[in-house]
Amino acid sequence: MVRTDVAIVVIGRNEGARLLRSLASTQGWRSVYVDSGSADSSVEAARRMGVPVIELSPERGFSAARGRNAGIDLLLADPSIRYLQMLDGDSALEPGWIAIATDRLDREPELGALFGRLRERAPDASIYGWMFDREWAVPAGPAAVFGGSVLLRVEAIRNAGGYQDDMIAGEDPDFALRLRMAGWRIECIDAPMAIHDGDMVRFRQWWRRTMRAGHAFAELVDRHPGSSLHDYGRSRARILFWAGLLPLAAVASLLVAMLLDPRAILGTILVFALLVLNLARIAVREALRHGVRRGVPFALFLMLGKYAEMVGLLSYWRNRRRDRAPTLIEYKRS
């Protein structure tokens, strides 16, 4: 039975066929699609399916947070709405998810947000799909954060103030953190929630998505300094050590060796030895967990990811220093 106190906000930008699958999964439920300047036929496709559409204007810049807030504002004009399902346009809801999740929220009024198992559409098509699927494998139980697909209690949304429009990355963990600060619980349950279609096939796509993570870590630390409810400061410190301090030490040692004392080259050698040893440690650990075929490449991506995150972190700092609004870090194919 479709409940009248539940509605769905779908957001997207140039999602193509992924959006059609996403909107099809919401049929029967009250929903709205919020488009962030798509250059494809997303808006027309949504309207053909009978879904109300909000087209964001480009003047304020596009962000997932702004899109979600626009959908929330429209749907909450109806005071009977108690729960809102957030859904990214690259994901399709699993049948029965909303019934399972709303029943849980009905029974536990202190729960502000609930999500279930997100699975990748083609996890074996490439290492990227496999890494997506692994990332989505959140254990059931209390959770600190949620992603773009989550069922939210309207009272909790209002209490925490919604998403931050000006965040181009990290808007979901930021909102999750503010929900917890306001006293709400977040939980993951062992139930299928949605199918995600990352459609990632190129290294450049992975690199830009990982850059976005570095940008998010930097901004989350700045927005929530000293909070005991997160460890983003530790994540930022790891980025700065592996992709900042060590490379600088290697270059400095090399310059000293070239200009002053050849023995200083030992510093560069030690840095590379440390990198190799850390890569070997991670490769062994992940190979034991996932097998050599997946574990070894995954270890390499984890190491390389620190450099992509460093680029994103520096991008955030540069924009902040210049008091300039950031622009989307896009990675998807149209």
Task: Tell where the protein language model's regions lie, with residue ranges.
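Membrane-embedded multi-pass helical conduit in multi-pass membrane proteins
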Residues: 243-318
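A recurrent flexible, glycine/aromatic-enriched loop bordering the glycosyltransferase active site
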Residues: 120-121, 135-152, 159, 167-168, ...
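Conserved donor NDP-sugar-binding/catalytic core segment of glycosyltransferases
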Residues: 92-126, 197
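A conserved acidic beta->alpha catalytic loop
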Residues: 35-44, 58, 91
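Glycine-rich, basic loop-to-helix element that forms the pyrophosphate-binding segment
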Residues: 58-77
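Catalytic donor/gating beta->alpha subdomain of glycosyltransferases that bind UDP-sugars
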Residues: 166-167, 173-231
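Short, well-formed alpha-helical segments that are part of the catalytic scaffolds
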Residues: 10-28
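Short beta-strand-to-loop acidic/aromatic patch adjacent to the donor-nucleotide binding site
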Residues: 79-92
